[in-house]
Amino acid sequence: MEHTKTRHCGQAGVQDAFRLDAVRDDAGRKALFARMCREGLTGCAMYAWADPREEDWLRLVSAPGRLLLQATAPDGTVLACGLFSPWRGQVREFDFTVFRPAFPLAVPLARAAFRRVFRQTGTSALWGLCPVSNRHAWHLATACSFVITGRLPAACWLARRGVHVDGIQLLCTPETLEHAVAASPSGPRAPQ
């Protein structure tokens, strides 16, 4: 993993310093998958697989051009991970998973990861498609600065249930991110 300086989330009253690291080795990738399995999060993070296996995860996150970030607390506890995949041009598709103990920090963790992706990869926008049934995920995405750009009929395949459901299409740009940060109760963060 590559070390980055500690980031502060910009959420008043929260002890929220953490590191963002790029996960570039299979040991780190496997540890994230094992954590998702232990916390029962693979059904949301990998909804298109009926029974996601470690090799599915490794194939997904290690494909060319993909960036897997991990947020880690100062004590070494992994808080979240985000997968950013090439989609079209300079737009990347995103998937962001917050581990259960860090749920209260989901918004600042995600915003910090999105900011890093914009600043370090030349990404012009982040795009996502979330099953309508995963309300918590798309509500969280809008809190993190994504804009709902549409509802696409039967766009998501829920493999475990064997059904198509509508998808909520989401888009975040550097501008929507900065606007959301500036409008947050704690105000904008110091430049990094």
Task: Give a label for each model feature.
Residues 58-65, 80-90:
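A conserved beta-strand-loop-helix scaffold within acyl/acetyltransferase catalytic domains
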Residues 1-28, 176-192:
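Conserved N-terminal entry element of GNAT/NAT acetyltransferase domains
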Residues 129, 147-162:
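Conserved catalytic-core motifs of GNAT/GCN5-like acyltransferases
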Residues 89-101, 129-131:
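Conserved acetyl-CoA binding element of GNAT-fold acetyltransferases
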